[in-house]
Each structure stands twice: as structure tokens, then as C-alpha cells.
Amino acid sequence: MLYRSLIALIAFLAMVPAAMAAEWEEGTHYRTLSEPVETRSGDQLELAEVFWYGCPSCYSMQPVIEEWKETKPDDVNLRHVPASLRRDWAPHAKAFYAARQLGVVDGIHSELFDALAGERRDLNDVDAIAAFFEEQGVAEASEVRDAWGSFAVDTAMRRGRQFQQGAKVTGTPTLVVEGKYVISVRAAGSYENMLAIADHLLEKERSGD
């Protein structure tokens, strides 16, 4: 009896992913853009994460994102798009692009989340952010200031705003799949669901459905 119960349980669990995928409904769990936004991942499929370093929900989502990255398909690129939906978010978006310009995103990304969302540190201008980079040992303050004022970072900020406007992003965290599908945590119900829906939509793009 116990053996049959275990077999039934295993069979049920094996069916769960397919059942869940069938439940992801357009207009309920995600929305489709009438005009897709530009992707920047070349031949790879793109999953864009729109985030703000000061966002508690984005901060809570990071462990889920990191776990997902460990088994991320090779044909998918995770693109980080720092939100600048409000004027006071702009310095934090610029901090990300300055870090990318300096090649130190991996060394500062989590630390910026910890400082801004976790500790609520006052890092709201170039001097404070440059000092923070130096404090973390990833770049000299002068290097951060140079990157901050560069044409490349200004261009990245402009493209990031265009992406957010085109995708009609109104809050963070938000996922955008292949420039076509937008997933919010409110619609998805959880961070885990956001990524499950993203995986479902990425597979939809692979199959051409």
C-alpha cells in the first residue's frame, strides 16, 4: 500500500511542471507587448531583469535569480536593466552602468543591493558611490567618476530608459522575455513564479509557438 502511494506521489510530482506551465495565461500572469522592445543579446534568447538597487522586493528576489542562473540554459542571456523610473533612482542606475564600463559588475552588484536595499545607506550621488566602490576594493574613486561622466554610460542610461518606456515597466522587479513578454511579481504571485513563467515563455520562443 505504501509502495503504491509513493508511486502515485512520484507520478503526480512529475506532472506538476507541465500542469503549471499550462496555467500561465497571457493577460493574467504576463502581458504581451504590442510592439516588442529592442533586445541586446545577439543570437541568444534574452531575459531582462529590470531592477532598482534600493528596492526591497528586488533585493529579496536576488537569491532566486542566482539560483536560476546556476541552471540557466546556454542559449539564454540574463540582461540587467537598472530602473530609472524616478529621478532619485537615476544615480543607482548610473552606478550599475559605471560598474559595467569598468568591468566590475560581479564585484559590486550584490554589495550595492546590500548597501541600498539592505542597509539603506545614503549613496545618492557620484561622490558617495565612487567612495563606496573604492571602499569595496573594486575600483578607484577617480575611475568611477571618469566612467560616470563617459559617453558610454550616458548612452547606456538613455537606452535603458527607452527599454523601460517601450516595455511599459511601472515597477520593480520586472522581467522582460525576448523583448516581447512582461512579467511583474504582482501578476506572477511570487519570485519563483516569475522565473517559471519566464522559462515557459523562453521555451515558447524556442519552439516558435
Predicted regions, residues:
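Structural microenvironment flanking redox-active thiols in thiol-disulfide oxidoreductases
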Residues: 73-102, 107-133
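Sec/Tat-exported extracytoplasmic proteins
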Residues: 54, 69-72, 99-103, 112, ...
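C-terminal cap of thioredoxin/glutaredoxin-like
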Residues: 135-209
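Extracytoplasmic thiol/disulfide redox context detector
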Residues: 2-87, 161, 166, 202-209
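A short alpha-helix capping/helix-coil boundary motif
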Residues: 45-46, 73-76, 107-111, 138-141, ...
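Solvent-exposed, acidic/flexible segments
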Residues: 43-44, 54-61, 85-92, 101-105, ...
